[in-house]
Amino acid sequence: MSQQDSPANADHRRRHSSIVVDGPGKAASRAMLRAVGFTDEDFKKPQVGIASTWSRVTPCNSHINVLADAASDGADAAGGKGVVFNTITISDGIANGTEGMKYSMASREIIADSIEAVSGCEGFDGVVAIGGCDKNMPGCMIGLARLNRPSIFVYGGTIQPGAGHTDLVSVFEAMGAYSQGNKSLIEVKQIEEVAIPGPGSCGGMYTANTMASAIEAMGMSLPNSSAQDAVSQSKKDDSRAAGEAVLKLLELDIKPSDIMTRKAFENAITVVIALGGSTNAVLHLIAMANTIGVELSLDDFTEIGKRVPVLADLRPSGHYLMSELVAIGGIQPMMKILLDAGLLHGDCLTVTGKTLAENLADVTPYPTGQEIIKPLEAPIKSSSHLRILYGNLAPEGAVAKITGKEGTRFTGRARVFNSEEEAQARINDLTVAAGDVVVIRYEGPKGGPGMREMLTPTSAIMGRGLGDKVALITDGRFSGGSHGFVVGHITPEAFVGGPIGLVEDGDEITIDAENDIMTLHIDDAEMARRRAAWKRPAPRYTRGTLAKYAKTVSSASKGAVTDLPEALDD
C-alpha cells in the first residue's frame, strides 16, 4: 500500500506532516502542494518549514532570502523537504524617534504568532528560523518554543563597518552633535552616506548581535552562527548546515524544550554579560523562558552578574565592532574560556546533538595580541554591566547598563516628560542641562504602548557631550546602541500607576548602581498624596494592533509577553 493510501506512518520524523498529506482523504492537500513543486517522493519526507524574515525595509534582512534558500537546500539534501515561508520584520533603526517605533515590540509577538500559525497550519515537522533585525531573534525563538518541534535558529549576520569605522549609532550621535552646534549638516550627511555599507545587522554589541550570541550560547544555533558576516560564504554554509541539522534533530527527536533548559538560559545570560550586551536581552530572555516554561526573573541576572565579568571591548561602550570579533574567531573561544573557568554549564544539550562542552572541546583560542576580548584576570569590569535596580521608584525592578565609564552614582533634579517627543524637543533646544535626570514616562508596554527605545534622546545627550552629566530614566527601554547613565524598564510603568508616574519637576532622584537602588527623595506621606491624586490617562489607541497589544501585554519585568494566562483571562 502506498503512503498516500495509508495515514499510518512509521516514520517518527513525520508525525506532523503525515497528518496533512497521508491517505486518500488528503488528496486535496497533496494537489495544492504539487502546485508548489512537491513530487510523489516529497510526500514521504519530513517537511521542514524555513521561516524567513527577508524584507527590503531594512539592510538587516535584505539578504535573508538567499540564506532561506540555502537552508531549504540543506534540508532537501539531508532527506527532508524544505518549504520557505515569510514572516515580518520592522526596522528599529528607521523607526527610532517616531511614533512608528511603538510597533517594534509588537512585531516580536507578530513574528512569534506567524511562525506558530504557519507551522501549525501546514504541519511542518521541523523549523529553521532566520532572523536579522532586533525583534526577529526573540520573535523567532518564542515561536519555536511554542511549537516545540525540532528547530534551529540562524542569525542573518553582522554588517560591515562604514567608512571611518562608523555604524548606525555614529549617525544618531552625529545628529546629537549637530543639535549642539558641534557638527554641520554637511558633516552629518557625510556620516549618513557611509555608515551603512550593505546588508547585515547593526555592527556593535547592540540588540541583534547580543540576542544572536545569547541564542548560540543557549544551544539553539549551530556553533559560530552568531559571529559571521552577513554577506559571506560562511553564512550561506551556516544556513545550509542548519537545514541539514534539523533532519538529525528530527531523527533524535530533540526539541527546543530539551535544549532551552534553566541551565541553558544561565549560559545565555553569562555570555551576554561577558560580551557587554544589550539591556534588551533581559526583556527577551525572560520572555523566551516564560514561553518554554522555565522560571527566570530579574534577580537571576543580578546573581549571575556577581560572578561574571565583562570581557568584550565592543560598542556601544567599547571600541570594536562585531565584524572585528568575527575576524578573530567569534564568541566560541570566549565561551571556551568561560567554560574552563566554570562559568558555563558544559552538560547542556545543543542543536548539534552534542553537549556544549563537546562543541567547545577543539575550539581554537584567540590569536595572541588581540585586544577585543580581555583575559579573565584583567576584565573591562569585574562584574556585570547589567544592573537590576529597585527602590521606591521601581518596586518591581528596573534595568540599567552601567560600564563604570559614566560613574556608578548620580543625583540630580527631575525633568519630567510624558512622551519621548516631549523630551527630545527639550534636549534639542538645550533646555536639558548638566545635573538633570530626564524622566520619560508613559512609554511602557501598556502606556506607550509598545515600550519604545530611547535611542534618539540618549544619542542626543551623548552628542551634546552630556553622557556623564545627565541621567535618563524611563518605563520605556533602550536600544542596544544606547549608552550613558540610563535606566529603563522601570516597573510598574506609569500607565498602571507606577511611582514613575508620580514624579514632579524638580524632585531629587538618586541612581545608585553600586547598591542597585533608585530613590525618589520624597517622604511616604507625599508619595501617598500624589498617588491619591493620580488618574490614569486615556489609552492612546483603541483599535488595531497597538490596542490589542496594550490590552494583553505583561509588565516588562515579566518579559512584556502577550500570552500570560492572567492577561488572556480578562
From Swiss-Prot:
[2Fe-2S] cluster binds at C60, C133, C202. Its EC number is 4.2.1.9. Homodimer. Gene3D superfamilies: IlvD/EDD C-terminal domain-like (3.50.30.80). Residues 1-25 are annotated as: Disordered. Its cofactor is [2Fe-2S] cluster; Mg(2+). GO terms for molecular function: 2 iron, 2 sulfur cluster binding; dihydroxy-acid dehydratase activity; magnesium ion binding. Pathway: Amino-acid biosynthesis; L-isoleucine biosynthesis; L-isoleucine from 2-oxobutanoate: step 3/4; Amino-acid biosynthesis; L-valine biosynthesis; L-valine from pyruvate: step 3/4. Keywords: 2Fe-2S, Amino-acid biosynthesis, Branched-chain amino acid biosynthesis, Iron, Iron-sulfur, Lyase, Magnesium, Metal-binding. The active site is at S479. InterPro entries: DHAD_IlvD/Edd, Dihydro-acid_dehy_C, DihydroxyA_deHydtase, DiOHA_6PGluconate_deHydtase_CS, ILV_EDD_C, ILV_EDD_N, IlvD/EDD_N. The gene is ilvD. Mg(2+) binds at D92, D134, K135, E453. This is Dihydroxy-acid dehydratase. Functions in the biosynthesis of branched-chain amino acids. Catalyzes the dehydration of (2R,3R)-2,3-dihydroxy-3-methylpentanoate (2,3-dihydroxy-3-methylvalerate) into 2-oxo-3-methylpentanoate (2-oxo-3-methylvalerate) and of (2R)-2,3-dihydroxy-3-methylbutanoate (2,3-dihydroxyisovalerate) into 2-oxo-3-methylbutanoate (2-oxoisovalerate), the penultimate precursor to L-isoleucine and L-valine, respectively. It catalyses: (2R)-2,3-dihydroxy-3-methylbutanoate = 3-methyl-2-oxobutanoate + H2O; (2R,3R)-2,3-dihydroxy-3-methylpentanoate = (S)-3-methyl-2-oxopentanoate + H2O. GO terms for biological process: isoleucine biosynthetic process; L-valine biosynthetic process. HAMAP family: IlvD. Belongs to the IlvD/Edd family. Binds 1 [2Fe-2S] cluster per subunit. This cluster acts as a Lewis acid cofactor. It is an enzyme of class 4 (lyase).
